[in-house]
Amino acid sequence: MCYFCDFASLRVSYFIINFKFQLTQIIRFRTPSGMLRVNATPETAFNDLLNDLGNQMGESDLSSFTFSDKPNDKGSSANTFHGKSVADLGLKHGDMLYVTRTATSSSPAVTASVNEPKSGSAVVTKPINTAGIIPIHGPTKVKQLEVDDVLDTQDGMIKRKKSNLCRHGEKGMCEYCSPLPSWDKGYREENGIKHMSFHAYVNQINEQKNNRNNSTSYMSPLEEPDYNVNLNCPSGHAPYPKGICSKCQPPVITLQQQQFRMVDHVEFADSGILNDFIDVWRQTGVQRFGFMFGRYEVFDKVPLGIKAVVEAIYEPPQAGETDGITLLPWENQELVLKVAEKLNLYPVGIAFTDLTDSGARNGTVLCKRHKDTYFLSCLEVLMAARFQIEHPNITKHSNSGRFSSKFVTCVVSGGLEGEIEPRSFQVSTNAEALVRADIITGSTQPSMLYINSSQGKRYVPDVFYSKINEYGLEVKTNAKPAFPVDFLLVTLSDAFPLNPTPRFTNGFTIENRDFMGNLQDLRAAYRYINSDPGNGSCLSNFHFIVYLVTLGILGDSELQMVFD
């Protein structure tokens, strides 16, 4: 045996492999899907390079894309490079090409109708690419709420008057009197505004992400957090829990107070709406739950603000107790929602009572919710998150066409002075994502949320919460096994109008109060109709309209007259 020949053969093989390795190049592509890399040699045909790129992008046909070696350049179509190799095009290791989808792209797509449950417009129509969702140039085409369309046309700049620091004439402007952006932190602190409005937040992110002078590089400013593990990882390993990698596992979660809120203010159209709702507790001592129906309007007390105007509270079937509520099956839910839709009303939130008499016999109640206890309990936070998930906010500023929710939670409880007062809240987008991923659950301590452990297909990443300590420094704390619910809460203001102009009247028996002896029947309807002064105002009662539709004695044309 000739060991020298074997050694020489081994050296030749090594040099051949090493030479081929040195010829291998990496060509980078900046695509709408992100940065992608393709291996090639100088002799590789550019068409083969594009085939590998198409596989990574999930695109079988790249004829609708252009390629350029300069950003923001129109570039050339893929057909231009037919028959050319990497060397012919002068491409070297590490070179980058910019890939742009042409405006006249006709990639195969199907149109899916996504029904929005009750919170925004009825239907969202959005093209969905069968090969995967591709970011588009410009805002997503969806049907938003009217208030969102109105606020999208406003810049929200905060005007300031000429101050003592100004040294110019009446027609001049300087840094002390120039308009402020709608998200200005100093303005919020000066005026006691805890959270910026949703549209101010969108404008702030747009300012950071998008160049208003270059519409072709548009990036949607909003993206909902997703803490689910990806069970279809592109790396090729077995799905979790059999396999996991950095591409499919969710990132580390850091919770902090949300800077913005989807709704800034809750306005009850008339105090009688809330009084009728609280009367159940006043007469029986049991708690009550209801769905608030109303509309969304511009709120001018906050830059680009939104307020929810509550016109009625519908009480679904429930079993009330002195310390809680059990919701029962709601058989006519779809009918109630259809009636509300006919009346141009939305389910804007829920309301529930948590009242305990103080025993002083002066009408005061105990103050159980304050900064030293909790404002919403852990179970109520989970409930609010689930309702918000069921009522998504439709927006053109997100690739998915959805972002968080405008659904609010109002709890009627005791104030610091023993008075009965409503308090309105929402939970953050992080709370919604944590509930979707089944990461959090309730605990025996109302002010704390418990973090679940990884089990089955549920993967729980590291969770931290960030707060400012007594020295003004930001400190991160491990959230496991439990963390305060305050990090998921968003507070709203609420009030009654000074000059109320409610859409509906009061007086008809409210539904599902049989246990109080208040029945919705023909006798109650007869008494209510006879109490009408003769101007038909009795038809302006939400509970009565729902009862009429439930009876089924009116035809479609007659019901339409009632709705009108």
Curated annotation (Swiss-Prot):
The GO terms this record gives for MF are: K48-linked polyubiquitin modification-dependent protein binding; ubiquitin binding; ubiquitin protein ligase binding
Q: Which InterPro entries match?
A: MPN (IPR037518), Npl4 (IPR016563), NPL4_C (IPR007717), Npl4_Ub-like_dom (IPR024682), NPL4_Zn-bd_put (IPR007716), Ubiquitin-like_domsf (IPR029071)
Subcellular localization(s) per the UniProt record: Cytoplasm, Perinuclear region; Endoplasmic reticulum membrane; Nucleus membrane
Report domain MPN positions.
266-403
Any single Pfam family the record assigns to this protein: UN_NPL4
- The organism's superkingdom is given as Eukaryota
> What does the entry list under GO cellular component?
Cdc48p-Npl4p-Vms1p AAA ATPase complex; Doa10p ubiquitin ligase complex; Hrd1p ubiquitin ligase ERAD-L complex; nuclear membrane; perinuclear region of cytoplasm; replisome; RQC complex; VCP-NPL4-UFD1 AAA ATPase complex
The alphabetized UniProt keywords are:
Cytoplasm, Endoplasmic reticulum, Membrane, mRNA transport, Nucleus, Protein transport, Translocation, Transport
Task: Please state the span of the N-terminal signal peptide per the UniProt entry.
Answer: none
Question: Which one GO biological process term can you cite for this protein?
Answer: mRNA transport
Q: Which CDD domains match?
A: MPN_NPL4
As for membrane topology, the entry says: Peripheral membrane protein
**Entry keyword 4Fe-4S:** no
Which function does this protein serve?
Answer: Involved in the import of nuclear-targeted proteins into the nucleus and the export of poly(A) RNA out of the nucleus. Has a role in the endoplasmic reticulum-associated degradation (ERAD) pathway.
Q: Which PANTHER family match?
A: NUCLEAR PROTEIN LOCALIZATION 4, NUCLEAR PROTEIN LOCALIZATION PROTEIN 4 HOMOLOG
Homology family? Belongs to the NPL4 family.
- By what name is this protein known? Nuclear protein localization protein 4
| Native species | Meyerozyma guilliermondii (strain ATCC 6260 / CBS 566 / DSM 6381 / JCM 1539 / NBRC 10279 / NRRL Y-324)
